[in-house]
Amino acid sequence: MIALSNALSRVFGSVAGYEFPSFIQKGINALYVKIFKIDLSEFEPLENYKSLNALFTRSLKKERPFDKTPNACIAPCDALITECAFLDNDSALQIKGMPYKAHELVGEINPLSPSFFYVNFYLSPKDYHHYHAPCDLEILEARCFAGKLLPVNKPSLHKNKNLFVGNERVALVAKDIQGNRLYFVAVGALNVGKMRFNFDKNIQTNAKAHLTQAYSYNPPIKVKKGDNLGNFEMGSTIVLFVQNTAFKDLKEKSVKFGESIGEFHAN
């Protein structure tokens, strides 16, 4: 199943990256925009994208404003928040009734502290596919886990136990503005050709070798709140684990990158 789902995603990625003649590509782009009801008001017009993948990975035409208050935590992406809560004995929910162990997702040996609050951000095919820093960060490590590329939509989350843990993913291990541990996990999915990270081009996902590896950064890579960390090549999921924060009531709400979703308490 791993080989099949990953192979399908690689094939889809190759097709999506193909540049058809402009008049054909414009029609393909227009159909995709219509099917998924994509709002292009913040982006270049659809005829500017030379491939479907270029449309998937579109950048904002101009910088989107965000809350620059130091203790504000912002949404890292445009997404639907499907679950959010404090960890319960290291358990988090991929969706209601489907728990998994948080330490397994991020690659730790020991259970995570119940002080961690987690948020699941589901990026659908219509969403802006880039992900950004939710606060000022020092990135210590990028842990890349080989795995399946199963869909991460709600029917699949209800059907497949430990889906996030079993799927290919990259877990960023970082320090937040207060020096507390923070995890930022990008989870792969079916038809997501790649997950890209701007701060390290060596990170390879959906590769044929199915390698699990870690990249350590000494000194840490410093990024500012709102900095573009990378992108999916279609929709997928970000899981954020943070400590010492107060979050708004977010479950089943759609958020936009830059929107304030909580704040860090003073240490």
From Swiss-Prot:
Q: Name one GO molecular function term.
A: phosphatidylserine decarboxylase activity
Active site per the UniProt annotation? D78, H132, S236
User: Where are the residues marked Cleavage (non-hydrolytic) as a site?
Assistant: G235, S236
Main enzyme class: lyase
Lineage: superkingdom: Bacteria
As to how many cofactors bind and how, the note says:
Binds 1 pyruvoyl group covalently per subunit.
Q: Which reaction does it catalyse?
A: a 1,2-diacyl-sn-glycero-3-phospho-L-serine + H(+) = a 1,2-diacyl-sn-glycero-3-phosphoethanolamine + CO2
Q: Pathway it belongs to?
A: Phospholipid metabolism; phosphatidylethanolamine biosynthesis; phosphatidylethanolamine from CDP-diacylglycerol: step 2/2
| Signal sequence range | none
Which membrane topology describes this protein?
Peripheral membrane protein
Question: Which cofactors, if any, are listed as required?
Answer: pyruvate
Question: Assembly and interactions?
Answer: Heterodimer of a large membrane-associated beta subunit and a small pyruvoyl-containing alpha subunit.
Q: What is this protein called?
A: Phosphatidylserine decarboxylase proenzyme
